[in-house]
Regions:
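C-terminal accessory "lid"/substrate-recognition subdomains
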Residues: 1-72, 80-85, 89-98
């Protein structure tokens, strides 16, 4: 499931993915950290290092271990239009085949 909304000069996009999907933690962290012009990135992922919650804002990059989630999900709030399909392809490339 994927959504994109634009309001008040910001673009918001989010993805919900099956709980059974497992992501490579370092590939995912690299992808999230290389994003540009974002206001907030928030997500929870089943990674090869356990379940992780990410909460990035301009003041802090924070991630931590969390209890198992109901699904994998991420939401990005950015200042400019974005190639969301490109981001989605890169996100799905972080997935580890089980």
């Amino acid at each position: 499931y994927h959504y994109v909304e634009t309001a008040q000069g910001y673009s918001v996009a989010g993805w919900k993915m099956p709980k059974r999907w497992v992501f490579d933690f370092y590939d995912l962290l690299d992808l999230l950290c290389e994003q540009q012009d974002w206001r907030r990135i928030k997500g929870i992922f089943h990674t090869n290092q356990g379940w992780k919650a990410f909460n990035f804002n301009p003041e802090q990059f924070n991630y931590q271990d969390v209890e198992e989630g109901i699904d994998n999900r991420v939401e990005l709030i950015v200042q400019n239009e974005r190639d969301w399909m490109g981001f989605e392809s890169a996100l799905f490339a972080c997935r580890i085949e089980q």
